[in-house]
Amino acid sequence: MPFLTALQKRKRVAWAEEFKSFDVHQWKNLIWSDECYVHLDDHSGCVYVTHCADKEYDENCVIPTFKQSSMQVMVWGCVMKGRKRPLAVLEYPGGRGGGMTGQWYISQVLEAHLHTFYDQMKEERPEVVFQQDGAPSHTSKLAKQWLVDHGISVFPHPRSSPDVNPIEPVWHELKKIIRALLHPPMTIPKLIKAVHDAWDALEIPGIDKYVDTMSDRVQAVLKAHGVILNFKYIFVDVLYT
């Protein structure tokens, strides 16, 4: 879980106080967004295989591992109540912080993927607001100015707070689908296809259940005095299914 300073905890409490009265109709107007890395050897979850006693090392009963350095893809996605935009695979620049800069974020995400979707949702839901986390590329002067110039309203999001972004458990679901593949992808092109297929397989009602927990998440932040919520709360499928 992310480390939070005392100041960050206070800011989380202040954020929760500001939005504790939001109802489901107001949360419905938010576009929740995030980047995510998917590794070729991402087996962070438990993987169990049932096999005969003499098949312990059969290639169909084991999961290969790979060097993680180059075998990964970076994706960007956004969801909102009742909507899921097609997943975007991003060019991975590498380096500190993934190599993301304000200009990179503008060209790879805001211009290429968000702009059209936001305008579409604006017609459908006039009070639509865009959420992004506090990554330096997101909060750079260039990115902020681009958002202002294009009339995109931004919802405040406390730093280091994945627990109050309902897209986080959606990533968890996506990776579970990929980990469950009988024949895991062994090349970057196959991994990209697997990621797209997994995203397409995620159903809207399954995403909506996470968005619908926002009021509970806000109250939990207040109750915890700003402390980061336990990851079992982030992955609310443990609690709500």
Indicate residue ranges for each PLM-predicted region:
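RNase H-like two-metal-ion nuclease catalytic core shared by retroviral integrases
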Residues: P2-A6, Q132-G134, S140-K141, P156-I178
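Extended, low-complexity cationic-aromatic segments
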Residues: Q8-H115, H225
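C-terminal anion-handling pockets and recognition modules
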Residues: Q26-Y37, I167-T241
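Residues that form ligand- and interface-recognition hot spots within folded domains
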Residues: E35-Y37, D42, V79, R83, ...
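Conserved, non-catalytic sequence blocks in retroelement Pol enzymes and Pol-derived host proteins
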Residues: T65-S69, G99-M100, W104, K122, ...
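RNase H-like DDE/DDD metal-dependent nuclease/strand-transfer catalytic core used by mobile genetic elements
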Residues: S107-H157
